[in-house]
Amino acid sequence: MSSFSFPEYVSWLKAGGVTAGTIALRISYLERFSRAHDLCTATTEDIIGWLENPEWKPATRMSARSSLRSFYKWALEAEVVEKDPTARTRPVKVPPRAIKEAPQDALLTALEGVGERDRLAIMLAAYAGLRRAEIANLHADNIEDRMLTVTGKGSRTRRVPIHPMLAAPLREAKERGGYVFRGADGWSPVTADAMGRRIARALPDHWSAHSLRHYFAGNVYRASHDIRAVQQLLGHSSIATTQIYTHIDDDELHRAVGAWAS
């Protein structure tokens, strides 16, 4: 059995703008697969059998298949293999699930109990919909009078209007210069994991930074009913992903039918 050692593949991913987190995830699946099968000689049957792991949820299985698909796309182009053994594997269906947004009282509780820096981080998630990595890497150069320029997944950039709640603290951050949230060395950015933990500690009842992103999406959608705008603000490549963020509860469904009936 072989272990994973294809630095050229990692370079290929980096050149394509794949984030460090995604690269690490893909390599972890490839390492696990290579402990059971040689990557250069694995067959379609080997891959299907490995993906049948009964302990995996559909989302895990989909991520594992995606990692193998990515590797064999490169391997075929690089002539490491003669054919792609993942080509005949079936896509994994993952049922969509609505993720709950943090309630407003959880947000208010968090904002009351933290210092200015953590308060700004929380508000960037709740009032700009930024991911934890996007918050961690925010630089003064990304801040304009009315807009933020955000670099998200896949190194894609988007522009997000600055909510009135964010105007003053972001203006101060702009004046200070450099990264808004700095690490222990005083100049480089904090890590995404550290940022996520910092926000989660401030929130009650096990809510997370991601639930604040849902809070932002839900409020923007309810105010505008413009799902395309929400998609752009969140930086989603697929509107199907945005639909998970804009789950409509039963009360809203009743109001919609009631409005038509009246």
What are the roles of these predicted feature ranges?
Residues M1-S262:
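Conserved catalytic core of the tyrosine transesterase superfamily
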